[in-house]
A protein has these predicted regions:
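Conserved active-site-proximal phosphate/metal-binding subdomains
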Residues: 1-3, 7, 11-22, 41-282
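Glycine-rich beta-to-alpha transition loops that act as phosphate-gripper elements at the mouths
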Residues: 23-40
Length: 282
């Protein structure tokens, strides 16, 4: 995140109080280059204001760290970060403005954040405009779906208009290979729910066609459809659609798609926004 205030002015006004309190003082990010960071560490930044040296204890490094050799960021993202021109030290990019390949938007915490001006930033700006206003979201629904489709977290689709097979296939299209074991666990639970819906038994346990962990999701869907042909024609019930949305929230790791377009869409889309920078698929 970034501030609209001058770091130097904040430090000059509060440095004595902070040091008197004995707290560990760190500053950043957005320091720009090693020389600027070093000036805060040795305190020389304060000399220009006619003060004695005012060293800090540490600096925060964000974007440069993502582009470093050691970072798990994929190479395409590193290259994009390096090639984005950025802005001159001491200048600002106003909220919604695009300059130097950068824009200032709002994070899922509704705090100001600098972003590369790409499809993700455009989507973020649109979602910030509609907020949690259900009428505004409904009025711009098609625009939102299109914006989501250009990001790493597209809209899953209208679940109640899908067959059970299509729902399972769409999940695999958007989430496999699993980036986290909980994504695969959700799929296993979804398979179990679908099989329970399609089997003849109306209560109690039933003999499952799956006798162990699902290692090949595409093969599992074929096996399910062969055992229960209705999977190809029966549309998802409202109860199962609600189960699906609840399932996406069940584990800490968010799913790599937006399951439903509602008043919580901004949070659903923005949760865990940096994970895709590690995966070349995105």
């Amino acid at each position: 995140h970034h501030s609209w205030e001058s770091l130097d002015e904040l430090l000059l006004a509060t440095y004595a109080d902070l040091r008197h309190a004995g707290v560990v003082l760190c500053v950043g990010g957005g320091l720009g280059d090693p020389e600027v960071a070093a000036s805060y560490l040795d305190g020389s930044w304060a000399l220009a204001a006619g003060r004695y040296a005012m060293p800090v204890d540490g600096v925060f490094i964000g974007t440069p760290l993502m582009a470093s050799r050691e970072a798990a960021t994929n190479s395409q993202v590193k290259r994009l970060l390096v090639e984005t021109p950025g802005i001159e030290e001491g200048t600002w990019v106003r909220r919604g403005e695009v300059r130097g390949g950068m824009t200032s938007g709002l994070s899922q915490l509704h705090a100001d954040i600098y972003e590369v001006a790409n499809a993700s930033a455009a989507c973020s700006r649109l979602l910030a405009e509609v907020g949690s206003d259900e009428r505004a979201i409904a009025a711009r629904r098609d625009e939102i779906v299109e914006a989501l489709s250009r990001t790493a977290k597209p809209y899953f689709g209208d679940i109640e208009e899908m067959t059970y097979r299509r729902m399972l296939e769409r999940y695999v299209e958007l989430a496999y290979p699993w980036v986290d074991e909980s994504i695969g666990q959700r799929f296993a639970e979804l398979l179990d729910r679908v099989e329970g819906r399609l089997c003849e038994a109306d209560h109690g346990a039933w003999p499952s066609v799956f006798d162990g962990p699902v290692d090949d999701p595409a093969a599992a869907i074929e096996k399910l459809a062969a055992a229960y042909p209705k999977a190809d024609t029966l549309c998802v019930t409202p109860a199962d659609a609600a189960f699906f949305v609840d399932l996406t929230r069940k584990y800490p790791k968010p799913v790599p798609f937006v399951p439903v377009i509602d008043a919580d869409i901004s949070r659903r889309w923005a949760s865990d926004t940096l994970w895709q920078s590690h995966d070349p698929r995105y």
